[in-house]
Amino acid sequence: IGDIMKEKVLLLLKEGEYISGEKLSEILGVSRTAIWKAINSLRDDGYEIDSVTNKGYKLVKKPNVLNASTISEGLNVKVVGTEIITLKTVDSTNEEIKRKAHENARSGLVVISCEQTAGKGRLGRKWASNEGGVYFSFLLRPELPPSDVSGITLAAGLGVCLAIRKFTGLDAKIKWPNDVIVGNKKICGILTEMTAQTDMVDFVVIGIGINVLQESFPEEIAYKATSLKIETKSEPDLSELMHEIIATLDKTILSYLFGISQDDLKLYKSMCATIGREVSLVRNGEKLTGKAIDITADGELVVCLENGKKIAVNSGEVTVQGIY
């Protein structure tokens, strides 16, 4: 039974009242047997469907899974989420997007999965794709020189942070340049990768991993990781959460593509937990310490060193006192 048929049956079952197999087959123009197979396939996917003789079928409970049609329902997007693909498992959503990009996929494609078998973090590190997380990447083909791409991680961090705040009410903050935190613990990481010619970007892939349903973490990361479920003491609906995140990312990325506005920069700074804290970093082999005081429009962190000199840091390892 095809996924499209299952989706169609599911949409008709959503009403919360009984609908007969006969009516379903009439509306969809398929046999009663095809309907029965689709119902059983949905049950295998975790949908609780009641069936009563002479009454038909009724959806009792949906499983908390990623559903592309639920995510895109009512979405009015321009640059992120113009096409959405959900996968049960994947090696890495960034790698999947790169493969699609080489097959000429259009800008705006989003790939989402609850399992990555070979997820990766910054500097090529292995990213622990714990069960309970949601991992997604999106494709952009901006007509920009490579030097203008650095601020894109800022726009993505801002979008995710705003969406988490709106969806959960949590006081999420941004740890420059690419993490979202709640109460000084990491809830989200962002990895931006780019393929470019000398003077023009071919495509950009932004990968985002969010801790959603985890109830605990391995001992070695428990002190620095948390999840939406731990923080809200409830279970967020994955598809509704992704709907909110994609809708918000579309706005912040669109704004970035037109040149990050002063308002967005102000908003980012107000939610950035790094500003005002003591930081240490390594530059040209030398360890430097100072205070993070600002973020530039290009997404650089401005640090006032102990000797009073101000430097702009564009990436690399910055350790922030008080945050993992």
Identify the role of each PLM range.
Residues 88, 174-176:
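Short loop/edge segments at beta-strand edges and connector loops
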Residues 2-23, 27-30, 40, 44-45, ...:
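Long, positively charged amphipathic alpha-helical accessory segments at protein N-termini or as interdomain linkers
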Residues 6-165, 188:
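N-terminal lobe of the biotin/lipoate ligase/transferase fold
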